[in-house]
């Protein structure tokens, strides 16, 4: 395009149809036992997570300067919810800079 006003003859569109994409899955398992193992592992995963401690990173603002304070904790999901409720309530975090002052 040259000039201040674009003209229709300056606009060139090249439309080409996309080639067809084969969406068929050709994956094959050796036996149905492998499928059963995968299903069993997927079913057991939430059960293990319920009682097992997991690492979490908590980010919250400093109550004095509003900078981000990061905590790394290891707990179960239920205990983490208690910490969340405490942080939403009256418990506040203080960054290291504000804690020294």
Swiss-Prot record:
A motif (Nuclear export signal) lies at residues 80-88. One of its GO terms (biological process) is symbiont-mediated suppression of host type I interferon-mediated signaling pathway. Pfam families: E7. It comes from the Viruses. InterPro entries: Papilloma_E7 (IPR000148). It is found in: Host cytoplasm; Host nucleus. A zinc finger (unnamed) spans 62-98. Gene3D superfamilies: 3.30.160.330. A motif (LXCXE motif) lies at residues 23-27. Signal peptide: none annotated. Keywords: Activator, DNA-binding, Early protein, G1/S host cell cycle checkpoint dysregulation by virus, Host cytoplasm, Host nucleus, Host-virus interaction, Inhibition of host innate immune response by virus, Inhibition of host interferon signaling pathway by virus, Interferon antiviral system evasion, Metal-binding, Modulation of host cell cycle by virus, Oncogene, Transcription, Transcription regulation, Viral immunoevasion, Zinc, Zinc-finger. Residues 1-43 are annotated as: E7 terminal domain. One of its GO terms (molecular function) is zinc ion binding. Its main location: host cell. GO terms for cellular component: host cell cytoplasm; host cell nucleus. Highly phosphorylated. The E7 terminal domain is an intrinsically disordered domain, whose flexibility and conformational transitions confer target adaptability to the oncoprotein. It allows adaptation to a variety of protein targets and exposes the PEST degradation sequence that regulates its turnover in the cell. Homodimer. Homooligomer. Interacts with host RB1; this interaction induces dissociation of RB1-E2F1 complex thereby disrupting RB1 activity. Interacts with host EP300; this interaction represses EP300 transcriptional activity. Interacts with protein E2; this interaction inhibits E7 oncogenic activity. Interacts with host TMEM173/STING; this interaction impairs the ability of TMEM173/STING to sense cytosolic DNA and promote the production of type I interferon (IFN-alpha and IFN-beta). This is Protein E7. It comes from Human papillomavirus 51.
